[in-house]
Structure formats: structure tokens, C-alpha cells
Amino acid sequence: MIAALYANLKRPPRTATEWIADAVRAIAIVGVLVAAFALPATDTAVLSMTLPAVMLSRMLGLRSGLDLAVCLTVIVAAGSNVIDLYRAWTGWDLLVHAVCTGVLAAVALVVLDDTRVIVPTGARRTPIVVATTAGLALSAVWEMVEWFGYRFITDSIFVTYDDTIGDMVAGGLGALVAGVLASRFRLTRRDRATV
């Protein structure tokens, strides 16, 4: 699997969307480096959480549109935290939770398929059920991270019961949409390296 991930990573971009995704990925990396010197440690930590997602989407050989969507979504999600958009714009939190969890659930589908945790059945319901389950799990983990940050790092993190449940519902709905889309469209490039 490592060889396939490396092969996908080093494959040169071939389409405009792939070039744009790589540019966004580079911006994410540079942004974290700049943040390390210019922003508080908590903001740098939040921004650095984008890096695994933006790199993994390239390494998995996702279709260019999904790769770009992953990159943009996680950067918007982290950036919204740093510049406090979640408090400033009502509903932004739920929208970002839905979209971000949706794209990450799509990534999870590819990882679970590549590692043979799930076996393609040909049934359209499989990616719907698996993506929704993965999205709900990711939402729960994220809410635990938020709680941990609030409890042990800074009380400026907004954590309430209603916010937590709302975020998880939005994430679950986003993952459900991702599963429906995955049941109808291929998530990976046809020419990607596989295990």
C-alpha cells in the first residue's frame, strides 16, 4: 500500500483541476509554516490538522474534483476556526460540519476499500451505509477533540450540548450525501496506483 500511496503522490498533475488542487495543497503547507511563526500555538495546531487530509487525498489518487474539494473544505474549516467565523456567522458551523464530514467520509470510503476493510459488493447501499457510519464516527471523534480542547487547553472553544448534537447531525447528513454520491460516481482516478 505504501508503494501505491507514493506512486500517486509523485504522479505529475495532468489536468487544470489537478494543478489547482496541488496549488491549494502547497498553500496549506506554506500557511501552516507561516502560522507557526505568526499565530498562537492553538491556531497553528488547528491549521496543521489540514495537512494529513490534503496530502492523503493526493496519495489516494482521488478524482481531481474530489481532491480539490477535500483540500478546499479542510482549509476553509480550519481557517474559519482561526478567524472566528463559526461565532460570527449563524449556521456556518453546521454547513462546514456537513461539507467537511461529507468529503472526509468519501476519503474514508476509499481508505476502507483500499485496505480491504470493506469489500465492494456492487450494492449501491454499501457506500451509503459505510460513508454515513464513518461520518458519524468522525463527527463523534471531532466533538471529543473539541471537548478535550475546551477542557484542557482553552475555554474559548464553544462547546455546548446543543452545538455538539447539531454538529454531529450535520456531519451525519453530509456523510449520507457523500455515500449517495459514492454509490453513483467513482471516487478515484482510473489511472491511480493501487495495492
Task: Name each model feature, range by range.
Residues I2-G102, A106:
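"…centered on the first transmembrane helix and the immediately adjacent amphipathic helix/loop
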Residues D22, V46-L47, L94, A123-A131, ...:
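Residue-level signature of transmembrane alpha-helical entry/exit and packing/kink sites
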Residues A26, L51, A98, G102, ...:
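Alpha-helical transmembrane spans of integral membrane proteins, capturing the lipid-embedded, hydrophobic core
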Residues V54-R58, T73-S80, A105-L109, A134-W142, ...:
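Alpha-helical transmembrane segments of multi-pass membrane proteins
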Residues D84-D93, A140-L176:
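Interfacial helix-loop-helix junctions of multi-pass membrane proteins
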Residues V99-R116, Y150-I157, G172-F185:
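Membrane-interfacial alpha-helical segments at the cytosolic side of multi-pass membrane proteins
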Residues D113-G135:
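Internal alpha-helical transmembrane segments of multi-pass membrane proteins
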Residues S183-T194:
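Membrane-interface capping segments at transmembrane-helix boundaries
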